[in-house]
Design a protein with these regions (language model features):
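Short, surface-exposed ligand- or partner-binding patches at beta-edge/loop junctions that are enriched
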Residues: 76
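N-terminal glycine-rich beta->alpha transition that marks the start or flank
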Residues: 36
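Rhodanese-like catalytic fold shared by cysteine-dependent sulfurtransferases
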Residues: 5-32, 40-71, 81-111
Length: 111
């Protein structure tokens, strides 16, 4: 669909550093939740300090862990694909300030 194509293009632009930048460091300093949607095993192998781990395939059934739909959520994974899916899931469930930060490792280097 057009929406998925648009999200994929934006992910590629983000990875290449094209287009407007989001200051994830500032969002996190202001209290944004870092949501890592990789598997439990991937998360155990390394993650951003204080990140919440909810694998993307469990996100729809775990939304109660993210109670405040107005709280800023910065999603990350290994490459940006699963976090893009997580962003769409959260937005379709009424979350208002959701960002796809792409790779957790890249995000960590910006913090």
């Amino acid at each position: 669909t057009k929406r998925i194509e648009k999200e994929m293009i934006q992910t590629i632009k983000n990875l290449l550093g094209i287009g407007p930048k989001t200051d994830y460091s500032e969002l996190i300093k202001q209290g944004a939740i870092v949501l890592d949607v990789r598997s439990k095993g991937e998360f155990a192998g390394g993650h951003i300090k204080n990140a919440i781990n909810i694998p993307v395939d469990q996100l729809s059934s775990s939304l109660t862990k993210l109670k405040d739909k107005n709280k800023c959520i910065v999603c990350c994974c290994a490459s940006g694909m699963r976090s893009g899916t997580a962003k769409r899931i959260l937005e379709s469930n009424g979350y208002h300030a959701v960002y796809n930060a792409g790779s957790w490792y890249s995000l960590q280097s910006k913090l």
